[in-house]
C-alpha cells in the first residue's frame, strides 16, 4: 500500500514580540516566520505486513465458506434419505392396505360360495331322494368332489379368520407395583387374594384398602412360602403368580365340594370339629372377574393368618389299625411340614427390634433365631415330617 499523507493545520497563537512580561532570549530570525501553517504527516506502517495480514484473513474466510458448503451438502443428503424412507413407508402402507382389502373382500365371497354349494347339495339330495328322475342326479364321484371343494373352502375361511385375528392387537393386563403406602382397588384385590390363600392383612388395612404394616407382613409371609425374596413389594410378576395360585385354589375347592356332595347318598361330609364360618367375599381382579369365596377357616392369632381348611379335613376319620402299623405318624407339631414359622420375626426374617435401636444394627441384619429364613426346623421331628 502507498504511504498516505494527511495535511494538518495547526494554528499556533503567536504572542506579541513586544511583551513586557517575558522576552525571548534569542534574536528572531526571519526564517522562523516563514513556516507554513499546514504540516504533512507520512505513514510509518509496513505495507508488506498489511498485505500478508489481509491474505491470511481471506484464506480464513475461504476455509469458513468451504466448511459451510460441506455442512449444506450433508443436510441435503440427510433430507434426501429421509424423503426416501418416507416414500418407502408410504408404499408399504399402501401394499398392506390393499392386502387387507383383498382379504376382507375374499372372506364374504368364500362364505357365499360355500352357502351356494351347500344349497346345491341339498337340492340335489332332495331330487335324488324324491325319485322324480329316472337316473340318479348326483354320482358318487361328483359328490366326493363337491365335498372336497367344500372342505377346502372351509379351510381357507378358517385360515383367513386366523390371520385377521392375529393382526388384531392383543390387549394385555398391566398391573402396577404395590408396596407400603399404596391404596385403592388393587390393594383390596391383593388383600382378598391373600386372605383366600390363608394370609390375613389385618382389620384396619382391609377396612381402608391400604397397604400398611399388616398387608406387608402378609405379603412377606406369602413370599416366604414361595421361597422368593421377602421384601414386601408386590411386582407385576408376583401379582400374576398370586392370582394364578388363587384360581388353582378355587378349582380345588370346587372339586372337593363336588366330591363331598356326591359322597354318602347325597349327604355332605363335614368334619366333627366346629369352625366358624367365614363370611362370603368377592375377589376382584383388574380383568373384572369375580370369584365367590366361601370357606370354613380358623384364624391363628399367633401366626396372624387364616388356617387352610384342607389341613383340617380328614383329621377325625377313623384310623384303620392294620394300616397304622405300616404307615408312619405325621408330626403333630409341624403338621407334617418339617418346619415352623419363626415367632420372633413373624415369618418376615427381619430382626424384631424397636425403632429407636435400629441405628445400632446394620441394614442387612436378619433375625438371629431363623437367620432370615422366616421359619425354623421342627425340633420334634427334626425336619423329617414324620415321627
From Swiss-Prot:
According to the lineage, what is the superkingdom? Eukaryota
Q: Which UniProt keywords apply?
A: Chloroplast, Coiled coil, Isomerase, Metal-binding, Plastid, Stress response, Transcription, Transcription regulation, Transit peptide, Zinc, Zinc-finger
Q: Where is the transit peptide?
A: 1-40
Q: Which GO terms describe its molecular function?
A: protein disulfide isomerase activity; zinc ion binding
Example of a GO cellular component annotation carried by this entry:
chloroplast thylakoid
Q: What does this protein do?
A: Exhibits zinc-dependent disulfide isomerase activity. Required for seedling and chloroplast development under heat stress, probably by maintaining plastid-encoded RNA polymerase (PEP)-dependent transcription.
Annotated protein name in UniProt: Protein disulfide isomerase pTAC5, chloroplastic
Q: What organism is recorded for this protein? A: Arabidopsis thaliana
